[in-house]
Amino acid sequence: MPTINQLVRKGRRSQSSKSKAPALNYGYNSMKKSQVNNPAPQKRGVATRVGTMTPKKPNSALRKYARVRLSNLIEVTAYIPGIGHNLQEHSVVLIRGGRVKDLPGVRYHVIRGALDTAGVTDRKQSRSKYGTKKPKK
């Protein structure tokens, strides 16, 4: 615990919080070949690998994921939500922040229904989250 004199001299420093989706905080300046601070809610990227991985201990499944090289040249792992997908290598995808609790190292989600990613077929509820159009009557 600091003394009164130490507090008078230095004061309290407020803690800075770490970003939960750090790859969305940067842009890339190709002229200077450097990262620039350019925060964005989503980023576009190209899928370099699409596959499945198994979740942490109490759960059991084959979760679909894509390794994505973003427009700022950072490579991240993104989860593909919903049942079935049409992604393959070199597909252009849009990602957003949001981790998957039982997949270590997965901090991003692929946005369904944007760019090359198709929406989930035959989905009736929560359609907006999965990029599905309203079904015809």
From Swiss-Prot:
According to the UniProt entry, which residues carry 3-methylthioaspartic acid? Answer: D102
**What InterPro entries does the entry give?**
NA-bd_OB-fold (IPR012340), Ribosomal_uS12 (IPR006032), Ribosomal_uS12_bac (IPR005679)
Q: Specify one Pfam family.
A: Ribosom_S12_S23
Q: Per UniProt, which keywords does this protein have?
A: Methylation, Ribonucleoprotein, Ribosomal protein, RNA-binding, rRNA-binding, tRNA-binding
The Gene Ontology CC terms held by the record are:
small ribosomal subunit
* Region: Disordered, residue numbers: 1-24
Which is one GO molecular function term here? structural constituent of ribosome
Q: Which GO terms describe its biological process?
A: translation
Q: Which residues form a coiled coil?
A: none
Q: Record's family?
A: Belongs to the universal ribosomal protein uS12 family.
What NCBIfam families does this protein map onto?
Answer: rpsL_bact
Its assembly, as annotated, is: Part of the 30S ribosomal subunit. Contacts proteins S8 and S17. May interact with IF1 in the 30S initiation complex.
Read off the PANTHER family from this record.
30S RIBOSOMAL PROTEIN S12 FAMILY MEMBER
- What is this protein's function per UniProt? With S4 and S5 plays an important role in translational accuracy. Interacts with and stabilizes bases of the 16S rRNA that are involved in tRNA selection in the A site and with the mRNA backbone. Located at the interface of the 30S and 50S subunits, it traverses the body of the 30S subunit contacting proteins on the other side and probably holding the rRNA structure together. The combined cluster of proteins S8, S12 and S17 appears to hold together the shoulder and platform of the 30S subunit.
What's the protein name? Small ribosomal subunit protein uS12
Name the lineage. Answer: Bacteria, Bacillati, Bacillota, Bacilli, Lactobacillales
Gene this chain is encoded by: rpsL
